[in-house]
């Protein structure tokens, strides 16, 4: 681990790119996998209660996506800026941005919690709850909302630490919270007989623990410390957060809208269809955690080296991540196609309708899985190097621009099969859009390299 900002700068701009990305990606991948695992563990434990509880967790997931969107907005918006400024060795600006992003997220998270609790029943219905699912949704959501400010602030701390090149410190905070959740959830659900309320309480307690640990970790390893006196809500900083964070807000916000629309579309075919699609969402998140974690290992490398004008290292890192991600997702897709029923059955074995819907949707997902490597890594690069328009277009495509029309069109013509195949169809269209958006930027960096070489020679 590195113990000063200067050490981090030298490390991130001189270490061979594949080794550097791998070293940064491993703790991030562990964080992502453990977080996804505890999401799946929640689904597994709640699935032991009944189908309605499983569906309720899937419905509330869309609200958690909105909360995450706020956290990622401020975390990525401030983190991208911090990595570029540290790459340019402008530490004071980076320190002010760190505190500004953190306190904005904390205040807005608290406001969201209050609003959600005031309108709990209308919100639960709007998210797609059927009359039989509504009581479970209200119980689960009412507790989850209490953890909102801790969740948004934790995501900011996690991303800021990671963008400074100290992913291992970020991992400790995230993994510790996830482990607490996995241990606490079955105790509260079954031993204390709290049911779905126990699952929600375990999640909130784990979020508070992560928040405290990340605050502590943020004071170690040469990381920028959060101080209220550095809170600088100036127009310049707000514009930087908007520019760097809008792609994340768009991506996560549309993911939430997509989940709501998916639940509403699936709800036409019964509670089992909602539960089946909810399980597939959690499985996909777990597999994608590797790719996202690997891409997040690339982001500090991308930000520091782009800020330092080392464009060849940015391009090298991009292609390395795309290749590794493609082959990993290809292996997962091939292996998963033959065992879709068995995978879904882990979460809801006693309900054949849930298994049938989930297995069909999972197979459709696997068909386009390898294309996700290009989409995800492209989006992360565009966002980190401050290409907000391209990054926002790409981030809005997968679960907005393409998914939203498809979730209305495909079920109309194909029924339940249209619901099951919707995400795969959207992924295919997003891949074709991502090619020109990314290739233009890669070519631009290559031109800048040539100009630098020409200047050195002259």
List each model region and its residues.
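Helix-terminus/linker motif at the lipid-water interface of multi-pass membrane proteins
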Residues: 33, 37-55, 124-131, 187-194, ...
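Transmembrane alpha-helix boundary and packing residues in multipass membrane permease domains
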Residues: 28, 32, 44, 61, ...
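N-terminal transmembrane alpha-helices
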Residues: 12-44, 48-49, 65-77, 81, ...
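Short runs within selected transmembrane alpha-helices of multi-pass transporters and secretion channels
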Residues: 75, 144-162, 170-181, 199-212, ...
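Short alpha-helical transmembrane segments in multi-pass integral membrane proteins
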Residues: 1-25, 82-149, 191-246, 302-368, ...
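Small-residue-rich hydrophobic transmembrane alpha-helices
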Residues: 54-114, 151-170, 276-340, 372-394
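Transmembrane helical elements of multi-pass membrane transporters/channels
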Residues: 23-42, 143, 177, 206-210, ...
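Hydrophobic transmembrane alpha-helices of multi-pass small-molecule transporters
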Residues: 66-69, 181-185, 210-215, 286-289, ...
């Amino acid at each position: 681990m590195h113990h000063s900002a200067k050490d981090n700068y030298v490390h991130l701009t001189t270490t061979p790119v594949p080794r550097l990305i791998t070293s940064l990606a491993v703790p991030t991948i562990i964080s992502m996998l453990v977080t996804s695992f505890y999401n799946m563990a929640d689904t597994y434990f709640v699935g032991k209660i009944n189908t309605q509880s499983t569906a309720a967790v899937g419905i509330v997931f869309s609200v958690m996506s909105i909360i995450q969107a706020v956290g990622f907005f401020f975390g990525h918006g401030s983190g991208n800026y911090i990595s570029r400024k540290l790459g340019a060795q402008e530490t004071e600006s980076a320190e002010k941005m760190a505190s500004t992003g953190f306190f904005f997220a904390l205040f807005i998270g608290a406001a969201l919690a209050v609003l959600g609790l005031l309108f709990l029943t209308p919100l639960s219905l709007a998210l797609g709850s059927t009359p039989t699912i509504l009581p479970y949704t209200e119980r689960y959501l009412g507790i989850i909302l209490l953890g909102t400010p801790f969740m948004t602030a934790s995501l900011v701390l996690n991303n800021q630490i990671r963008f400074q090149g100290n992913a291992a410190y970020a991992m400790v905070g995230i993994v510790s919270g996830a482990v607490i959740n996995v241990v606490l959830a079955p105790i509260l659900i079954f031993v204390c007989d709290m049911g779905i309320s126990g699952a929600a309480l375990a999640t909130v307690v784990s979020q508070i623990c992560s928040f405290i640990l990340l605050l502590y970790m943020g004071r170690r390893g040469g990381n920028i410390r959060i101080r209220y006196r550095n809170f600088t809500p100036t127009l310049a900083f707000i514009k930087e957060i908007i520019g760097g964070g809008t792609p994340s807000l768009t991506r996560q916000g549309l993911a939430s809208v997509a989940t709501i629309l998916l639940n509403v579309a699936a709800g036409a075919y019964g509670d089992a269809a909602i539960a089946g699609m909810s399980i597939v969402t959690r499985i996909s998140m777990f597999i994608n955690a590797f790719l996202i974690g690997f891409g997040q290992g690339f982001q500090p490398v991308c930000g520091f080296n782009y800020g330092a004008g080392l464009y060849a290292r940015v391009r090298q890192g991009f292609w390395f991540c795309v290749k590794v991600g493609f082959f990993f997702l290809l292996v997962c897709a091939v292996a998963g196609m033959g065992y879709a029923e068995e995978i879904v059955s882990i979460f809801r074995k006693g309900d054949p309708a849930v298994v049938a819907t989930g297995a069909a949707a999972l197979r459709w997902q696997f068909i386009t899985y390898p294309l996700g490597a290009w989409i995800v890594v492209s989006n992360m690069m565009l966002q980190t190097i401050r290409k907000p328009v391209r990054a926002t277009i790409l981030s809005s495509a997968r679960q907005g621009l393409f998914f939203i029309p498809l979730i209305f069109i495909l079920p109309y013509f194909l029924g339940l099969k249209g619901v099951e195949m919707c995400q795969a169809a959207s992924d295919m269209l997003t891949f074709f859009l991502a090619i020109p958006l990314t290739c233009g930027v890669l070519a631009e960096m290559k031109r800048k390299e040539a100009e630098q070489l020409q200047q050195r020679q002259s």
